Amino acid sequence: MSIRTILFDLDGTLIDTNTLIKASFEHTFKEYNLNFSNEEILKFNGPPLVDTFNKIDETKADRMITTFREHNIREHDNFVTAFPHVYDTLEELQNRNISLGIVSTKMRHTVHMGLELTGISKFFSTIITYDDVTHAKPHPEPVQMAMQKLGAHPEHTLMVGDNHHDIVSGQRANVQTAAVAWSLKDTNYLKSFHPDYIIEDIKDIITIVGDSFA
């Protein structure tokens, strides 16, 4: 099926926020006298903050979320950059009349901070954030909402992400899925969720789009 719409996760997929997120978790855990290994912190990267902190301590979750977000916003511009070839790839997709959207588990404010800082906001016709949905990824609602706003059809849509919940959300919404090999998650781990594609470089999407019209 030809691909006419591409939905992207943001953090870890288009922009590199990994160091910022790790630093924000470490800052928060230090404030609350909690100790987690790097491996454990890695697992916290991706799901909504409310889910992560509720699992740690429901009685302190709201305060920990506030601490995390304050640090994350304060340090944001010191850490965040776009991954290589992202700008040129998005520009080429736009030139090919591919509809582009963002589907993120972050709050709208911080999503826009990242998009504006890296100069890629102009490429996206819709942006779905944690604030916009009742059920975050891996529920299909965010992907379905993005498609509805773009007038897209599942059979012509691709969801691209760096985490299993991106892949599962896309699959539950009956769209094609692609996992990125530069994810902090092990590639074999992502393969276990059976995405349609594993991309080594964001530019690979150009080939996928071209092949879909062949």
UniProtKB/Swiss-Prot annotation:
Its EC number is 3.6.1.1. It comes from the Bacteria. Gene3D superfamilies: HAD superfamily/HAD-like, Putative phosphatase, domain 2. It holds the Pfam family HAD_2. InterPro entries: HAD-like_hydrolase_sf (IPR050155), HAD-like_sf (IPR036412), HAD-SF_hydro_IA (IPR006439), HAD_2 (IPR041492), HAD_sf (IPR023214), PGP-like_dom2 (IPR023198), Pyrophosphatase_Ppax (IPR023733). The active site is at residue 9. Belongs to the HAD-like hydrolase superfamily. PpaX family. This is Pyrophosphatase PpaX. It comes from Oceanobacillus iheyensis (strain DSM 14371 / CIP 107618 / JCM 11309 / KCTC 3954 / HTE831).
